[in-house]
Amino acid sequence: VMHEGKILVSWYKNGFRDHYALIAGFAEIGETIEETVAREVYEETHLHVKNLRYYKSQPWPYSESLLFGFFCELDGADDIIIQEDELAMAKWVTPEEIFEIPDNFALTNEMICKFKQDMIEYGHLCL
């Protein structure tokens, strides 16, 4: 989720705290992946989104599932109310506030790096 040159990052309650994550979740039966994005963002942060743009997918062996990466924009107020049983923290950060991301294969890290690089180099996300 992007808003005014910032990206929404989080730390999952039971996850790693050495790098940021993006909001994520699983599709429910009968739900499109676009509906999943909107629902998961709202459930975890109480934020609404618009202008969803598919980035790419990645097989995820840990849960035997397929990840779908989307960039989207905030639609409405930017006040974050986290789902405390899932998230330890969620906040808006500028590209300059994104600290070094460990070199790993996770799609979420690739997307955060792309946001940072594109915003610094071009002033906008290049998709």
Q: Where do the language-model regions lie?
A:
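An acidic- and aromatic-residue-enriched active-site/binding cleft used to recognize and process polar
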Residues: 12-13, 57-59
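Hydrophobic/anchoring residues in structured secondary elements
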Residues: 54-57, 92
